[in-house]
A protein has these predicted regions:
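A short, structured loop/turn motif at beta-sheet edges
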Residues: 16-21, 44-48, 62-66, 91-100, ...
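Edge beta-strand at a domain terminus
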Residues: 105-144
């Protein structure tokens, strides 16, 4: 999976690559034109690594060849209301500067009338959510 480095070899220039930290909203535009959004909480897990928590799950994204890469399992929700937990594998890649990329989903079980192996590619855009930890403004106390 990872090759070892030769002693004395220069490492990747992590300092030149934008990192992610904080709260984000990921918007996926489906091939049909519809959109889905999810909230992410992102924390660094070392050079070229971020841990992304989305909903009840979480996974590490790694910087590979100048792109963030995240491989995970996803749930499938069908138009008829049926639901398959962890029914698709997802391979997401996005540019660390523009925070745009793709998410390719491959069904690993039949769902929504589609066979295993069915793939769909969404366009994704990730935006940092403004911090809500601003200093609260005092509320005036009414006088009698």
């Amino acid at each position: 999976m990872f090759a070892g480095l030769v002693v004395g070899a220069a490492g990747p220039a992590w300092a030149d690559t934008p990192t992610m930290d904080g709260s984000y909203t990921e918007t996926a535009t489906l091939p049909s034109g519809g959109t889905l959004t999810s909230s992410w909480t992102v924390n660094s897990c070392g050079d070229g690594c971020v841990f992304i928590k989305a909903g009840a799950g979480g996974s590490q994204a790694r910087l590979v060849d100048g792109q963030w890469v995240l491989d995970t399992l996803n749930n499938i929700s069908c138009a008829d209301g049926s639901y398959t937990q962890y029914g698709a594998s997802s391979h997401m890649t996005w540019d660390p500067t523009t925070l745009t990329g793709t998410a390719q989903h491959t069904y690993i079980v039949p769902a929504c009338g589609r066979p295993p192996g069915y793939t769909e590619t969404d366009q994704i855009k990730i935006e940092q959510t403004p911090s809500t930890s601003a200093t609260p403004t005092p509320t005036p106390t009414p006088t009698s």
